[in-house]
């Protein structure tokens, strides 16, 4: 099921996780659910009136089973570059494996057993890169290569799992699902300082905020 939360911004509800469709310079898929969410992604795009083949790029906030899971299943109809950052991009390419010495790395290794790697072009992202109207901000902690994307033009922030939503407020990624909670807190503070104003906060878990997203991020940052 897809819901338009702002002009040109659609939430693709995959049950326990969100993906998004953003009409930027090209139709842009943001994250891709779990390996079991192919039907939800396809159905959500159909609800929004977009063919899978029309997707011009994929923006990944990070590598996790519930954010990259359908990419392999969506090809070859999906034929678009996938933008990902650093270590997470290396995981998606199959060049690296998550470290066993970190509890989150172990979770990722287990998730990798049921997650196929996509045969798609993986484009490395760097902090400050402009991708369409979005700017990439490296926000490590939940994963080493977690990245948020903010479009000043659209007033939209794609926050992935840096934060989640609960009762209309943003909450930082917790220890159980993060590599480094100290880095999470630093990333929240940094993004709150660096990002331009935005209304819409698209989160991986919970409900997206349709207004006041930047204010909610600053409120959270002030507590960390």
Q: At which residue positions do the language-model features occur?
A:
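Short hydrophobic/aromatic-enriched beta-strand-loop microsegments
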Residues: 79-86, 103-105, 158-160
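Metallo-beta-lactamase
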Residues: 35-36, 87-138, 144-216
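Terminal disorder- and signal-encoded targeting elements
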Residues: 1, 219-221
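Conserved beta-strand hairpin/beta-sheet module of binuclear metal-dependent hydrolase folds
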Residues: 2-48, 148-165
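Residue-level marker for buried hydrophobic side chains located in beta-strands
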Residues: 28-30, 59, 82, 156-158, ...
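Active-site metal-binding motif and surrounding structural segment of the metallo-beta-lactamase
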Residues: 38-84
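Pre-active-site segment of Zn-dependent metallo-hydrolases
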Residues: 27-58, 103, 108-120
């Amino acid at each position: 099921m897809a819901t338009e939360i702002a002009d040109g911004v659609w939430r693709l509800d995959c049950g326990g996780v969100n993906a998004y469709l953003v009409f930027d310079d090209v139709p842009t898929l943001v994250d891709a659910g779990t390996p079991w969410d192919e039907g939800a992604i396809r159905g959500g795009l159909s609800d929004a009136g977009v063919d899978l083949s029309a997707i011009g790029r994929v923006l990944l906030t990070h590598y996790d089973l519930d954010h990259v899971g359908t990419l392999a299943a969506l090809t070859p109809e999906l034929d678009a570059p996938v933008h990902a950052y650093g270590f997470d991009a290396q995981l998606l390419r199959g060049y690296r494996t998550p470290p066993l010495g970190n509890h989150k790395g172990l979770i990722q290794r287990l998730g990798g057993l049921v997650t196929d790697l996509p045969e798609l072009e993986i484009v490395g992202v760097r902090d400050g890169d402009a991708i369409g109207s979005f700017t990439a901000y490296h926000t490590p902690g939940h994963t080493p290569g977690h990245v948020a994307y903010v479009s000043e033009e659209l007033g939209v922030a794609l926050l992935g799992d840096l934060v989640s939503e609960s009762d209309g407020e943003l909450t930082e990624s917790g220890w159980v699902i993060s590599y480094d909670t100290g880095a999470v807190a630093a990333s929240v503070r940094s993004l709150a300082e660096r990002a331009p104003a935005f209304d819409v906060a698209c989160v991986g878990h919970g409900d997206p905020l349709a207004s006041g997203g930047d204010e909610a991020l600053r409120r959270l940052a002030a507590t960390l």
